[in-house]
Amino acid sequence: MKHTISVLVENHAGVLSRISGLFSRRGFNIDSLAVGVTDNPEISRITIVAEGNDYTVEQIEKQLNKLIDVIKVRTLPAHEFLQRELLMIKINVGADKRSEIMTIAEIMNAKIIDLTHTTVTLELSDTTYHIARFEEMLKPYGITEIVRTGAIAIQKGSDALQVKK
């Protein structure tokens, strides 16, 4: 089962390396990784998606909490968080198929971000599931290039992962 782990860390060099090293040493695979500075420039938030049972995730949390630069760790409960990825995808398409691509983009709420005589580049921000569905819909047209971010996630409701001010 996939688990989403949110980690607040001190924002300085080497922190991400120590966290990825911990996963590597323990034999845990990272399926998705996203890092960004929070509203406090001294703190970054790392969102990790990893496969494992509850025991494995509990061990990951314990190991992360032992790292000096880690401020807080929380495994986000399934169905209690919002998750998004960003996809940019370039399709090599002639004029005859362009309207089909635009219809798919409209149905999936994707934006056209670049258009040339031979290519259409689309952007979609959505759940991992919908991103994968969109990609599958476009495969028959010939994907020239594809770029995906790691997943980011935030807990639903009033609960928040933050450092008390």
Locations of regions flagged by a protein language model:
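Long, contiguous binding/interaction regions
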Residues: 1-45, 49-165
